[in-house]
Amino acid sequence: MKVKLICVGKLKERYLKDGISEYQKRLSRFCQFEMIELTDERTPDKASFADNQLIMSKEAQRIHKKIGERDFVIALAIEGKQFPSETFSELISGVTVKGYSTITFIIGGSLGLDSIIKKRADMLMSFGLLTLPHQLMRLVLTEQIYRAFMITKGSPYHK
């Protein structure tokens, strides 16, 4: 199984890079994990609604190029479904049973995701109503993916 994490913007903070690297190493026992960082568009000060839409559209084009035709796509969006870790684990296991070999998670840029990407997604997922930095969300999601595999395995990691 392959798990892709497509992110808009470059990861800057060393502690986040280190945390993600640790979970990538742990995930290598269960799947081929790939994090794809895409260039984000600069958002001008006092950007108009039209400016924001254009920025999200450009980012969506970059995202779309990295999604495989047969990928099961989960886009992170505030309006998405929320799951406890156990249900998330079942979801990941269920995707492979349905015949998908790749699960692709998408984290948009600071403006969010364009509707085209949300429509392409097989599922919208939310980690709640809190606003978190997109870079921190990468670490949180990577840990939850690892946790999902550990739950499936029956490991005491998830207590």
UniProtKB/Swiss-Prot annotation:
Gene3D superfamilies (UniProt xref): 3.40.1280.10
Query: GO CC terms for this protein?
Result: cytoplasm
* EC class (word): transferase
Q: Does the keyword Cytoplasm apply?
A: yes
SUPFAM superfamilies, A to Z: alpha/beta knot
Residues bound to S-adenosyl-L-methionine are L76, G108, F127, G128, L129, L130, T131, L132
- Catalytically driven reaction(s): pseudouridine(1915) in 23S rRNA + S-adenosyl-L-methionine = N(3)-methylpseudouridine(1915) in 23S rRNA + S-adenosyl-L-homocysteine + H(+)
User: Quaternary structure?
Assistant: Homodimer.
Cited function: Specifically methylates the pseudouridine at position 1915 (m3Psi1915) in 23S rRNA.
Q: What is this protein called?
A: Ribosomal RNA large subunit methyltransferase H
Q: Which organism is it from?
A: Streptococcus pyogenes serotype M5 (strain Manfredo)
